[in-house]
Amino acid sequence: MGEGEMIGLHASVGRGALALALAFCAAPALAQADKPAGPGQSAPDAAAPQNGSEANEPAPGDIIVTAQKRSENIQKVPLAVSVVSEAQLKASGVTQFQDLGKIAPSLTVRPAEHPVNANVSLRGVGTFAFGIGVEPSVAVLVDEVPLAFQARAFTDLPDVERIEVLRGPQSTLYGKSASAGLINIITRQPTDTFHARFNVMGTTDSEYGGNFSLSGPISPQLGYVVSASYSNWDGNVRNLFNDKKVNGREAFNTRGKLRWEPASNVTITLSGNYLNGSTTVGRPFIRMDPTALLRKMPGQTQAVTMPGVTIGPDNQNISNNYNSRTKYEGGGGSLRGDVGLGDLTLVSITSYDKFRLNDYLDHDDTSSSAAVGNNIQVGQFHSQLFTQEVRLLSSSAKPFRYTLGAYYANVKFERPFLRGPAFSPANWYATSKSEQIAGFAQIDWEIVPHLILTGGGRVQNEKVSYTFRDNLAAPGSQFFSGSASDTAGTYRLSGRYEVTPDLMFFATYSTGYKGQTYDLTTGFNANRAAAGPIKPERSRDKEIGMRAQFLDRRVTFNLTYFDTNYKNLQAQTIETLADGTTNFRLTNVGGLNTKGVELDTTARIGSDLNLTGSLAYLDARYTSFPVAQCYPLQTVAQGCTGSPARQNLTGARAIQAPKWKFSVGADYSPSLGGNLKGVAQANWQYQSSVYYVAEDPQTFQKAYSIVNVGLGVRDKDRKWEIVAFVNNLFDVQYYPSLVNTAGNFGDNTGNKIATQAVLPRDFRRYGGLRLGVNF
């Protein structure tokens, strides 16, 4: 597939864009109004975030977010919202999407052997499933445009202005992919004057990269911003079979915007993006029974199948005779129009996105020359997404304000898959389609001074369909297809009381919804087809909180308590076949409760020192999961009973849900005389223990903490900056993902312990140098 095909917009999008542009150009004849405030804002009173270099400075005034689809002071929003600025990303050593969990404690990002299998969770809730068409519980948006695949986000974060993390169900305003929350990545807007930014970086372990951004006016009515980034890292795992490093990545991203203001009340923004990258895969064994044989085959010992590899918790070596890797390419565009109509703002967002990923995996993870050591897995993921949203916003300055909207989405997925030939053979092709239409509304009413009540609702209809062809099945049992439709509603009720301009209390009750889907993975058969789709996931959330600022708004203290119940949570379990092979199955968990406390705080001490702190206490447990799959090697004494074997996880802690997690950061810029200022940055992250598979001791990660630091010098006006940094200062080893692969190893007495790890970027301490120039 060529680059032009990837970024070309569907013809219907082009026709819609042309019609939208013509309609907006005609708007001045229909209404005389002030110029709209910009994307996501209501006219004429919402303030736009700064786009120049000074945007990185901690502002003494308001932090503006678009969590409720209009620009608001974060301290006035009755939701659990946290904002991460570009400066915080740099100070914390965060350059990739998967690093976000280090500075947003309620957020956990779990990597995998390739980006599609990685997943995101908020407050212990996420969708951990490999099947196509399975929606995430945490939506990811870029400039308010949704991504069909979360994998689309697992790359560099260039030209980011801020990242908004909305915790808890957000289905009322954002739809069915936000039943646990959402992440909105906001990129920079065109500036009124020319501005250029260049950044380069290199590390002691051979990572290098850079990015640039150019922005400015083309004419008084037309502005632009264009950015690009490139990064390359060999990895931190060595494949002894060919002496090459793996677990690395290479990525190129580019993004551009044109903002046209044909009239004082009209703003049209055309955006486009393209990405191209690859990853190399290496999952070292950190535990293995010394008597284990590959697929229980005589003679296939560790010394034969993994020569030179010393298995242990510090292992960074593998021996694979097949090059496990992924290659991906994606592109898309959006057209946004904002029209001021007196006290109203009409917003339209049209988007199209296309993404393709090819994955290649050494399925046995060895270099054995026997037939059993040459099992490979090859597949592709294709996605196409078209969306259209229209909303009407009233003025934020009035005591009664509202947001009305309609949304349409059409998404298509394809997945060809091949595995074999020695064991666990598979050869199938699946497609999944979804079409949804929704209407939503939210009303805010200040019934008496300082007391605001909010009510919102959403009604949506979705039709899902699939095809599945199993090329290895017996004639007559090869092809399946089906469809289902569902209409559902969600709502949100809240009240907030502003005691003073700097102190607010709120209470919120909201519901979430994630649509039904089909389990299109290896093993799909007539029984699964007859069972129909996996049930929709529903959630009910209660929150109370306080938003406070002190000392002339130099100290911010935001506290939230939440209690959320999930019914029919869509989750992935392990299915162990008669030969010991494990497949993954999608199922419904009867119930899950997640409750806890979140704290976000910042302090500006003088003009040189800025402190940040975030903490999350989480108690996430299954309230009903009596028939869960047993994990590999689980015994009767460990709770695996019955026929077929199963375990009761009711009352157990949810996976990937640490009880405690916090992040503390400091950014100090003392004057060094003249035009120079020093740079001293530190970030400390802590996470308590987690299971990656429920109650499986082989996937248990103990508590750990990581410290990142940086020292440098910069111009007082931030025209340039040089920072030397060290990540994982104390060289702490941890695993963001563990996989129990006992099904592939054993002897004539049964399967044996075998555990593999996905190593994080900072598995070992490393240093680097970062240079930035702004003018």
Could you tell me what each predicted segment is?
Residues 7, 565, 685-693, 713-775:
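C-terminal beta-signal and adjacent terminal beta-strands/loops
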Residues 58-193, 544:
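Acidic, small-polar-rich N-terminal luminal/periplasmic segments of exported/outer-membrane proteins
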Residues 402-403, 453, 563-565, 587-691, ...:
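Gram-negative outer-membrane beta-barrel transporters
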Residues 334-340, 345-363, 498, 504-514, ...:
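Membrane-embedded beta-barrel scaffold of Gram-negative outer-membrane proteins
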Residues 118, 135-137, 149, 158-161, ...:
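Outer-membrane beta-barrel translocator/receptor signature
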Residues 259-263, 392-395, 399, 407-409, ...:
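Structural signature of Gram-negative outer-membrane beta-barrels, strongest in the C-terminal barrel
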Residues 184, 191-193, 201, 213-322, ...:
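Periplasmic-side early beta-strands and strand-to-turn transitions of outer-membrane beta-barrels
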Residues 2-92, 99-103, 264-265, 333, ...:
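N-terminal Sec signal peptide and the immediately downstream disordered periplasmic leader
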